[in-house]
Each structure stands twice: as C-alpha cells, then as structure tokens.
Amino acid sequence: MQILNPILPVMEDILGNLAELKASGKITNQQIDTVELQWYESERNILRKTSKSGREVAFRLLKEGQRLKHDDVVFVSESLVIAIEILPSEVIVLSPKTLPEMARACYEIGNKHSPLFLDGDEVTLPYDKPMFEWLQAAGFGPQKAERRLSQALRANSAQGHGHSHGHSHSHDHHGYHHHGDGNWHKH
C-alpha cells in the first residue's frame, strides 16, 4: 500500500533550486509538487500552505535572510520533491538609464515605504495606481506588467519598519502591512 498524502516534516531549510538540483542529479524522476505563494507570503518566516496536489506543508524558516524564491526546493525524497512557485502579480516596472536615476527612483519609492525588487536591470514594485501616477508625473516612465516579485531589496531589515522624524506624515503602504516583524502581506 502506498501512502498518497504522507505527513511531511516542517520545512526549515531551502535545499537549492530546481535547475541546480536537477543538474546535480538529486532530482531525477520524482514527482514534483508545488506550493504556490503570493510575493508577500515568501517573506514570512512561519507559514502553512496546501500544495497543488493537496499536501499540507508547514514552513519555519528562522535563519537570517532566509526567504523563499521561485523554484526553491524545500523537500526531496526518493519519490517526491516540493518546490515553491511565486505567482506572478501586477507590478510597476522602472528601467533607470543611469546610476543617479536608479538612486533617485529607489530613494523616492523607499521614502513612500513601498517594497522594491530587482529584476535584472529593472526595479519592480507591487502595482498601486497612485504610485504609478506619481512615478509618471515625476518622469520615471513606469510600465505596468505581470511579473514574479522575488528579489527584494533590503535596507535595515533587522531594524524592522520604524523610524521617527521631527515631523509626521502618512505612511500609506497601499494595502500591504506587517505586524512589527517586517513581513509584508495583505488581509
């Protein structure tokens, strides 16, 4: 008798990515099951999800800087591989032409507390209509696209998301928020 939905251990490590593990021979003819995540779920340290084939998968990723990316492998056995699929989402794409333009774009977006991602030579961020319109008005030439957000830029991530100034201003996060742990999500 074969167990179709075995109880899996808690996933605490990222073993590599699909391409590397296939090239090294660690993944051959095993069934590959995937766990779909929204970009903001990939930032969470503790998470429970159901895979495409119905397996309950629990994550406890407590090592510093450990973040799930598209095609990461979290489980390998003789018969099964569990990999991560970061779902594409609506994004704003910026293609700065110079380093000063890149610095200015990142500074301005960061000042609005929006998460930033690198995708090759482009900067991407979750789509938000007011942000898109502001970037257009500021001359950054934003484009709207569907992409996977998985290479987050981090600044002072160990510090969390708090600061103070000699003044106050709105901290609009466009529907995304965290509970003091730096892990962004929407309800």
Swiss-Prot record:
GO terms for cellular component: cytoplasm. SMART domains: UreE_N. It comes from the Bacteria. It is found in: Cytoplasm. GO terms for molecular function: nickel cation binding; unfolded protein binding. Its main location: cytoplasm. One of its GO terms (biological process) is protein-containing complex assembly. Residues 178-187 have a biased composition (Basic and acidic residues). CDD domains: UreE (cd00571). Residues 154-187 are annotated as: Disordered. Residues 162-177 have a biased composition (Basic residues). Keywords: Chaperone, Cytoplasm, Nickel, Nickel insertion. NCBIfam families: PRK13261.1-6. Belongs to the UreE family. Involved in urease metallocenter assembly. Binds nickel. Probably functions as a nickel donor during metallocenter assembly. HAMAP family: UreE (MF_00822). This is Urease accessory protein UreE. It comes from Actinobacillus pleuropneumoniae. The gene is ureE.
